[in-house]
């Protein structure tokens, strides 16, 4: 049976950045490190561009998982920041769940490290509580492709939608006429080839 197309709505969405920690990032092998960090920061930038409530959380950061990556702290200095003392599933942490529910949003855009644990566990828990969950696959990382696909299968079968940060941005924006320069700048900052495209566009526009 075909599932209905549930679109992301910028007025009903929140972003959850789960366990993007220095130690855990060293485990990511299914995406090249530089590309992965770029994707994570791109997701952060689109959250700011669309004014989406954003929640940061870490797990056992005083241990080997390490602290939240500095760039995310810098992006969201005033965002709710839940340092979980030991809960592996972020949804098992009362403060985290309270912060999520306090946004008043039904759609949750989730990314994190590692995919099959730090993303999958809260995603499945949120679905069980009636949220629409959108997993940002290229801003989530894990050990290898086998592990990644196992996590994707589990989440998608439970009802999560798997998307990329670029797809998320486009679906939230809906129409280029809403803001050409703003969205193009977001893309250009994180996709080198898109920067070339916009340079060409700007040149042609100025010639008219």
Label for each model-derived stretch:
Residues 60-63, 87-90, 115-119, 144:
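Acidic, metal-coordinating catalytic cores used for nucleic-acid/nucleotide bond scission
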Residues 86-98:
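Short phosphate-binding loop-to-helix
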């Amino acid at each position: 049976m075909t599932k209905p197309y549930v679109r992301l709505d910028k007025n009903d969405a929140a972003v959850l950045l789960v366990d993007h920690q220095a130690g855990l990032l060293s485990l990511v092998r299914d995406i090249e490190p530089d590309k992965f960090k770029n994707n994570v920061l791109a997701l952060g930038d689109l959250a700011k561009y669309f004014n989406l409530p954003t929640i940061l959380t870490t797990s056992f950061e005083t241990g080997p998982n390490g602290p939240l990556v500095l760039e995310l702290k810098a992006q969201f200095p005033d965002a709710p920041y839940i340092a979980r003392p030991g809960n592996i599933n972020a949804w098992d942490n009362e403060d985290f769940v309270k912060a999520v529910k306090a946004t008043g949003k039904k759609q949750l855009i989730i990314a994190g490290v590692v995919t099959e644990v730090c993303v999958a566990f809260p995603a499945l828990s949120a679905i069980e509580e009636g949220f629409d969950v959108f997993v940002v696959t290229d801003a989530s990382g894990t050990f290898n492709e086998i592990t990644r696909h196992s996590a994707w299968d589990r989440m998608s079968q439970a009802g999560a939608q798997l998307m990329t940060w670029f797809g998320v941005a486009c679906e939230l924006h809906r129409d280029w006429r809403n803001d050409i320069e703003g969205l193009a700048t977001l893309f250009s900052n994180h996709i080198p080839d898109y920067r070339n495209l916009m340079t060409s566009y700007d040149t042609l526009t100025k010639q008219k």
